Amino acid sequence: MSWNGVKRKVAKITTWEQRRDSMNGACFNCHDHTFVDNFYHQFDSLVVLYNDKFAKPAQQLMDELTKDGVLSAKAPFEHEVQWVFWELWHHEGRRARHGASMMGPDYTHWHGMYEVSKHFYMKFLPAVVDAAAEKSPELRKKYQEKVTQLLTRDENRWIKGLSPEEAAALKKAFKERYNQWRGSWI
């Protein structure tokens, strides 16, 4: 059914590759190949970043919580972690992906990936441990260890911060690259 109640039939199902080729045709009406290729590189990179850093680890934790009997498929919004998980995908994640697809930096970053990051680290991961703790102390410990292990991955190193040597090297590289600017914050 369509929005107006009239039943419609899809004439042809196309693949994502066919849809992208069709969209490229529209893009090339105004933009050259470099512009279009760079856009898709940035867009695809954001989707991969979202998927690999947030969506896949979150889905794995949700699947494991379900397997351990902490979550029930019959009660999809029983625990806080289920709400936050849904919002990571549907609300913040969708805004980031749609913002990137429409070249909207404010929606891509502030209303998208910033919110995804904030809720993943500050709400979702603690809610994983809290949900497990409701089931048993053993599961709380198991999921605290899983979260701790996740936070040791390279993409999450920022949480720990830089060593003094790493900070000095970063500051030196920054000054070498931007030495024409003498701001007080460097």
Feature roles, as predicted:
Residues 1-186:
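Primarily the internal scaffold of c-type cytochrome electron-transfer domains
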